[in-house]
């Protein structure tokens, strides 16, 4: 299985990657 990557920026406080939450300035895995 492929691991979820949570490296997107979330300056607006929202992550679009499933299973990730915003930890400004980037998304982190739940």
UniProtKB/Swiss-Prot annotation:
SUPFAM superfamilies in the cross-refs: Cyclotides
Highest taxon above the source species: Eukaryota
A Pfam short name: Cyclotide
Biological-process GO terms, alphabetical: defense response to bacterium
Keyword Disulfide bond: yes
Covalent link (Cyclopeptide (Gly-Asn)) residue numbers: 1-30
Disulfide feature: 6-20, 10-22, 15-27
Coiled-coil spans in chain: none
Tissue expression summary: Expressed in root nodules but not in seed.
Keywords: Antibiotic, Antimicrobial, Disulfide bond, Knottin, Plant defense
Modifications the protein undergoes after translation, according to the UniProt entry: Contains 3 disulfide bonds. This is a cyclic peptide.
Similarity comment text for this entry: Belongs to the cyclotide family. Moebius subfamily.
Function: Probably participates in a plant defense mechanism. Active against Gram-negative bacterium E.coli ATCC 700926 (MIC=0.5 uM) under low-salt conditions. Not active against Gram-positive bacterium S.aureus ATCC 12600 up to a concentration of 100 uM under low-salt conditions. Exhibits immunomodulatory activity but no cytotoxicity in vitro.
Comment, domains: The presence of a 'disulfide through disulfide knot' structurally defines this protein as a knottin.
The protein, known as: Cliotide T20
Lineage, opening ranks: Eukaryota, Viridiplantae, Streptophyta, Embryophyta, Tracheophyta
């Amino acid at each position: 299985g492929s691991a979820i990557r949570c490296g997107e920026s979330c300056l607006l406080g929202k992550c679009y990657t499933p299973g990730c939450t915003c930890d400004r300035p980037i998304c982190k895995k739940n």
